[in-house]
Amino acid sequence: MNNTPIGNRKSIVLVGNRNAGKSTIFNKLLGFDRSIVSSVAGTTTDPVWKASEMIGYGAVRIVDTAGLDDIGKLGAQRVAKSEEEMRDSDLLIYIFNIEDLVNIEEEIIRKKIKDIKNKYKDKEFIFIANKIDLLDEKILDDIKLRYKDFIFISTKSKENAWLENLNNKIIEKLKNTEEEKSLLEGMLSYGDTALLVVPIDSEAPKGRLILPQVQIIRACLDEGIKVIVCRDSELEETLKENKNIDLVITDSKVFDKVADIVPESISLTSFSILFAREKGDIEEFLKGARYLERLKDGDKVLIAESCTHTVSHEDIGQVLIPNLIRKKTGKKIEFEFVYGKSLPDDLERFSMIIQCGGCMMTRNNMMNRVYAAREHNLAITNYGVTLAYLKGVFDRAVY
C-alpha cells in the first residue's frame, strides 16, 4: 500500500479558514492522529500529508493545510503553501465552521464558493459544514435548507455515520477525475515485447532499480507485455538473441549509443519520454526542445527536479544537460536549479524550463509547471526530450 509512488496517488486536500476543524477531519479520514488538533486558531502551519489506502478506491494522498485566513507575513507564506497544495490537488474538501454560515450573509458565502470554483476549475469539490453541535436544532434545520449542497457534520459525534458518508462522497468525486494515460498507451499492446536498457554507472543505486524503471516494468506486466532488461554494454548481444523486440526503452544518458545499435526497424524511446507523455504535454515538450537552438549568450535556463539527491559527476540535471547545451549552442548560458514542488516566483528571469522526468510527480504537478511556463511565455521541455535533441536522436525517437 504505502509503496505506491506519490506521483500515482490522487491528492485530496482539506482547506478552509483557521479553526474550522480541518485537522480533526484529516485525522478521522486517516484513522489515527497525524495532525495536531487544538482550539487555538492557526495550529497547522505547513501542509501535513499522509499516504493512505481508501477502501473502495485505492491509493490516495490526504493533505491538511493552514487556514486560508491566516494573517501577518508568516500567515501569507502559509496561505501560499496551502494554495500550492490546492493547485496540485484532484479533490478539494472545503470546510466551513457552521457558525460562519449563520453569521455571514449567504450571498457572501456563495460568492466565496463561486470564486474558488472558478480559480480551480479542473478540481472536484466537497463542501462541509462542521461543528453542527454548536447550533440548536431549529437554526441548524434552516441552515441545512439553505446549503443543500453541503455535508453537515460534528466531529464530536460518537457515531461516525458522517465519516462513512464523507468517504463515499470522496470516492464518488475521485472517480470523476481525469484518468491518467497509461505509460505505454499507443506504444505497446498485449503480447508485445519491450527491451529496457539500464546502464549501471555511478548514479545507479546499489542493489535496486530506480523508480522509473520499476514503474515501466510494472506497467508492462499489468498489460501482458513481455519485458527483457539489459545493460547498454550487452545491448547488441541481447538484440541478436531476441528477434521479436517491438520497442526499446532506454535511459536518456545513453540515447545516442543505443540509437547507433538498435535497428531502424525497432521503435526507440526513453523512460523520461514515457513519463513526459503520461504526466505532461508531450507536444509542448517537443516544441520546448526545439527552442534550445534559439538560446543566446546570457540567457538563463531553469532546471527543475521534483526530488532531491546527491550530485555525481554523471548527474543528468546538474552536469550532463548543461554541458551538452553549452556544447550544442556554443553560447554562454546560465543555469539555475530548483528542487521539490515549488518554482521560483520570478520566472520571467528565465528563457526556458527543463523539467525532470517527474516519476515522483502527479499529472497535476507537472501540468501546473506547463501552465506556469505558458503564463510567462517560456519554453518548457523535459530531460528525456532534451537529451534526444542534444544527442541527435530527436527524429529517431518515438513520442
Question: Can you annotate each of these PLM segments?
Answer:
Residues 17-23, 207-399:
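C-terminal effector/interaction modules appended to NTPase cores
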Residues 187-213:
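Long, well-ordered amphipathic alpha-helical subdomains in the mid-to-C-terminal portions
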Residues 65, 95-100, 125-139, 152-161, ...:
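G-domain G4 guanine-recognition motif of GTPases
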Residues 1-76, 80, 84-86:
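Conserved G1/Walker A P-loop phosphate-binding module
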Residues 51-58, 74-151, 182-186, 209-228, ...:
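Conserved C-terminal guanine-recognition region of P-loop GTPase G domains, centered on the G4
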Residues 13, 94, 193-195, 300-302, ...:
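Conserved beta-strand elements of the Class I
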Residues 123-126, 131-186, 193-195, 224-226, ...:
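Canonical P-loop GTPase G-domain recognition
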Residues 39, 68-74, 98-105, 173-175, ...:
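Short, flexible loop segments at the rims of nucleotide/cofactor-binding pockets, characterized by
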